[in-house]
Amino acid sequence: MKILHCADLHMDSPMETHMTREQAAKRNAEILMSFQRMTGYAENENVRVVLIAGDLFDGERVTRRTVEGVLDAVRRTPQIDYLYVSGNHDDQTNAFADQEIPENFKRFTDKWNTIKYGDVAISGIEITKNNASALYEQLPAQKSRVNIVMLHGQISSACGVDQVNLNLLKGKNINYLALGHIHTYSCEQMDRDGIY
């Protein structure tokens, strides 16, 4: 089973600190096109699941055109599931309001949920101020051969919104911790069983 992991696309970010409004609009169009190309790549490579670990959009500024562009790309690849956990820049409620969400676009909420694909279990949760401390004890125990956990936050020794306490996830039978928020690729050993 092939899985593709992405995060922090920040679609429709204003980007006007270092760019003119026209340059920012062009860059945002390129980011949407990159997402659409990624879905085509996933289709060509027979990817079964795309993990979107937060900050797909950049706050309330996201346009209807961008949301429709994302959902159209998802609809064009119905054989691929897109698992999405929102991040600190996402405004999930407004972005998807009045949109028909395709069946293959699955959103994690502020409660743990697990989706299974044969012997692979993928669990995810949106970190909020109400669950930031308790989510580590509430992580569903999975007996699958491969266990993946999706979170959006910075590696930390604390528990809070936008923070992932790596120490509290060690020894929990996690094979891959799919993170967002960090804006850089890395692959580190989490414990003897897993990487992040």
Predicted regions and their residues:
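N-terminal active-site segment of His-dependent metallophosphoesterases
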Residues: M1-E68, A141
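His/Asp/Glu-rich metal-coordinating catalytic cores
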Residues: V49, D58-Y196
